[in-house]
Structures are given as C-alpha cells and as structure tokens.
C-alpha cells in the first residue's frame, strides 16, 4: 500500500509526504550471477530453505520550490527519505563444490535501514536548461553480516554496491534554432563490493 499527501501553502511551494510498504519474494537475482561471472568465478547460488520474503516500510517528505525570476524559471527540491527493511536478503559464501565452483546461499539478514536526503535544482532560460541533483544516503544492515567464509574478512554493516553519495547533471544549450548541444554527467561515490 501507498499513501501520499500534498499541500501547497503558496503557489510556488509544494509540500509532499509519502508512506509505502512492500515486499520482495524469495529469489536469486540475475545481477548476482552477472557480478560473480565478471569477477572470473563461477558461482552457484541456492536459496535457503528458510528464506522468507523481504518487507519494507518507507516514509519520505519533500519541499518543492518553483519560481520565475524574470525570464529564468527555477525549481529546487529537498527530499528526505527513510526505509526500514526486515528479513533483508543477503548473499553468503558457503564453500566450493567438487568442481571448485563458488557456492553461495541467499539468506535473510536481520534487517537494514536506508536513509538520506536528495537535492535537485533546475533552471530554464530561453536557450538553456540545466538540471543537477545529489543524493546523500546511509545504507546499513542492523547487524554486521558475515559475507565470506574467510575468517580474515570482517563482517560488514555497510551494504555492498550502495554508495553514500551519488549525483547527476544535464544541460542543453540551443543558441540558434537549428543547433542544440547537450552535456551530461553522473557521479557515483565509493562503495564496498564483495569479491
């Protein structure tokens, strides 16, 4: 289920609040197979017989500001979000088979929390449009998860392949009617990748 509330205290400001909940059915994911194959290892992923569905509860709130300054139209968005995951899916090494293939098992972890803030800005002028955004987030398991059978590798609370910072920008310039140029970019912050 999902519930949304929107309120406009002025013509230039939108306030939004949202709540949602959902689940993911037990399964092994294609990206797990692809990522392991890229690392040069063949992995056989099995689903734990005790695997339960993953559940989530999410809330978010945002302030959206729209205004025109003469010929320039601007928009700024500030959004906060929080998601609580229960029975979060984790992937753990459980050994190797007789052909030396890596054996991994999809299990339930204790849970995880994802929270952060999203900032976006847009500006439009007659011949130019610029948009940029950044997300600062924290994705952590509630308890450190042991992801490898190697005793020298410490368990991690930080979620894998989940950067704390990422962002983007896009821009389009049309100085004359028959010519348009675009410039875009993305930034992905550092992250942990299990291997």
Q: What do these predicted regions represent?
A:
Residues 12-14, 39, 89-91, 119:
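Extracellular/periplasmic, surface-exposed regions of secreted and cell-surface proteins
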Residues 35-47, 92-108, 151-154:
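Surface-exposed loop/turn segments flanking beta-strands in extracellular/periplasmic regions
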